[in-house]
Structures are given as C-alpha cells and as structure tokens.
C-alpha cells in the first residue's frame, strides 16, 4: 500500500487551479489518512476557492492519481487557503472579462419547460448547433445541474482543460459546451442544495474562458426552481424559449415557466412544440401521439409566436461522429431546427 509521504508527493505535485502553483509549494496538502486494510486514502486539500468547477476537476484528478497508485477508494475534503497565501501567490491582473461584463455581451437564450420529459435538452442542443451552422459563435451551458445530459447527447467524451485561471469549454459541432456532467465521475448523482447550484452556475459565467460568443444557450432544469430563479436574477436581459409537447397538460404546466419569465421581465421569444406528431415513412400519414394543439394554445396564452413543430423521428447516427441526439442539417428535423434558428437570429438582429 502506498505510504503517506508518497501520497503527499503525488498530490503535492498537482497544480492549484487558481494560483497555478504546486499544491505542495502552497502547503495545501493538509491531512492524509491511510487505511491499508481497506485500501482507502483520505486527503484534505486547501484551494484558493472552493465550491467551484475547478474544485470538481482537481477532485477528479486527485482521485484518478491515487487510484492509479493503488487505492481502491479515495475520500477528499476541501478548505480554503489563508488569504495571505492567496495574496502572496496571485499575480496582479486587470479585471477579468467574463460573460457578464464583456464589451459586446452575447444574447442569452434560456430554454425552459414546465415539466421534464418534453425533450427540452434535445431542443437546446440542436438549437445551439443550428445557430452555429448559421455562422454564429455559440456557447451552450447545461444548467440542469441535477439532470445533466448535454455531453452524452452530443457524444462528448473529453473534459474541459484549464488555462491560467480559467476553464476552457469543450467544443463540438462548432459549439462551446460546459456542463456539470464534466465534473462528476461517470453517471454519479449530484446531491446538492439550492445555494450550491447557484454557485456552480455562477462559475460557468465567471470562471470559464468563453472567448467571443454571439449566443449562449442555457438548458434550464424543468420547472421554476432554484436554478431558474438564479438565472432570472443573474441575467436580467435573458431571453426565453418555452418547450412543450402538444399534450394539453404539458402545455398547461409549461405556461408556468412562461409566466415566471414574464413576471421577471424576461422576454419570451416563442414556443417550440416538440414531439408534435409521428409521420409514417411508408405512407406519410401523421399520427398525433400526444394530442394536438398544445403548442398553439400555449403560444396564444403567452402572446408569442409558435417557432416550430418538431416531429418524433430519430437522428441518422454516424458511427464515426456518434452523437445520439444531434440531427444532421440535411435531416428533415435538422431542417426544422435550422428554420427555427433563422427565426430567432432574425428577431435578435432586429432588436440589436
């Protein structure tokens, strides 16, 4: 079993994500406990900031290093470095440019729904990609912290990297992507309370190097909970798109998300009716599996346009570039998304 001095050396050689100095140089490896009979290692580490995406990333890196050295299980605790240590090692710099203080800020488009299971994340992914296909610079934030799915939908298998004090988003299909899914091990659940959710979302805005972007699409959690409230507070100029199925109940519940946007002075750009119908490949006959008219009724209630109806149909999967929820631009549904993206971009261009 690995010894304590070996653990200290391995962890101490890793770089603190904010100060970019070895943890050992910062005296940041605080406690080490080893249980040889259980092959368990417990480490307490100090960082310049805790509760951040960077903490999640270095946590995963430490776990991987120690498991590679022979541990079966790893326990990690974090605390913040003393202010004097942070001040000593942090280089002076000008105000950091973030998504919220750019000279030319992007258009924020939040994709919301009243309930889960209506295909909101699929819409978010394909809308972001369709905007990128129009030549726009697009970022996509998977803000569904508990139910993150964007990396899997887009077939992303790599994780963000760190450059300086910022995370670099993963880019695929011309879209820069950031998700909680990058910072948890495999399909592990996120067991957090509301304040931690808002903190992580804030990190996606402030601690990620997005570069120049025209649009940031946010895939919100369903409903009107903590994350949706945080978005309304952090992004007062955010636009919203409401996703519903044609089913009357889904449309009724989706109206709550729309009403919340209106009450907080967020413009609702329009409604997208997902799973609108199933069209037979043989006969062309349409079956309205989830009913009919829910999207129209919702759009009328919110006094916004129905941006499009998206039928039930699988994407054409490419084994070389596997992305289970992405529609090719020449796919019939890909063409519908492209049309929706054009409508949204035209409206945003007029407003600018």
Swiss-Prot record:
It comes from Bacillus subtilis (strain 168). Homodimer. Interacts with BrxC. Keywords: ATP-binding, Hydrolase, Iron, Iron-sulfur, Metal-binding, Nucleotide-binding. The keyword Signal does not apply. ATP binds at residues 114-121. Belongs to the Mrp/NBP35 ATP-binding proteins family. This is Iron-sulfur cluster carrier protein. PANTHER family: IRON-SULFUR PROTEIN NUBPL. PROSITE patterns: MRP. One of its GO terms (biological process) is iron-sulfur cluster assembly. HAMAP family: Mrp_NBP35. Binds and transfers iron-sulfur (Fe-S) clusters to target apoproteins. Can hydrolyze ATP. Induction: Autoregulated. It comes from the Bacteria. The gene is salA. One of its GO terms (molecular function) is 4 iron, 4 sulfur cluster binding.
């Amino acid at each position: 079993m690995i010894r304590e001095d070996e653990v200290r050396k391995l962890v101490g050689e890793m770089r603190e994500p904010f100060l970019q100095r070895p943890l050992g140089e910062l005296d940041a490896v605080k406690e080490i406990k080893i249980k040889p009979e259980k092959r368990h290692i417990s480490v307490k580490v100090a960082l310049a900031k805790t509760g951040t995406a960077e903490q999640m990333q270095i946590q995963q890196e430490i776990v991987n290093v120690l498991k590679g050295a022979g541990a079966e299980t790893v326990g990690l605790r974090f605390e913040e470095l003393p202010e004097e240590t942070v001040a000593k090692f942090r280089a002076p710099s000008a105000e950091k440019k973030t998504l919220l203080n750019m000279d030319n800020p992007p258009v924020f488009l939040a994709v919301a729904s009243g309930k889960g299971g209506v295909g909101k994340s699929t819409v978010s992914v394909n809308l972001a990609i369709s905007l990128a296909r129009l030549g726009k610079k697009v970022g996509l934030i998977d803000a569904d912290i508990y139910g993150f799915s964007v990396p899997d939908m887009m077939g992303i298998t790599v994780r963000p990297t760190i450059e300086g004090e910022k995370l670099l988003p993963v880019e695929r299909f011309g879209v820069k992507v950031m998700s909680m899914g990058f910072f948890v091990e495999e399909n592990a659940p996120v067991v957090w309370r509301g304040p931690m959710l808002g903190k992580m979302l804030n990190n996606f805005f402030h601690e990620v190097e997005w570069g120049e972007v025209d649009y940031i699409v946010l895939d919100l959690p369903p409903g009107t909970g903590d994350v949706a409230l945080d978005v309304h507070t952090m992004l007062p100029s955010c636009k919203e798109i409401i996703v519903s199925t044609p089913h009357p109940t889904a449309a009724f519940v989706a109206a709550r998300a729309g009403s919340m946007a209106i009450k907080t002075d967020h413009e609702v750009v329009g409604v997208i009716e997902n799973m609108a119908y199933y069209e037979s490949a043989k006969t062309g006959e349409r079956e309205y599996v989830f009913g009919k008219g829910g999207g129209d009724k919702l759009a009328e209630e919110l006094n916004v346009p129905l941006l499009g109806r998206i039928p039930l149909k699988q994407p054409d999967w490419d084994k070389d570039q596997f992305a289970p929820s992405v529609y090719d631009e020449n796919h019939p549904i890909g063409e519908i998304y492209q049309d929706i993206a054009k409508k949204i971009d035209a409206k945003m261009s007029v407003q600018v």
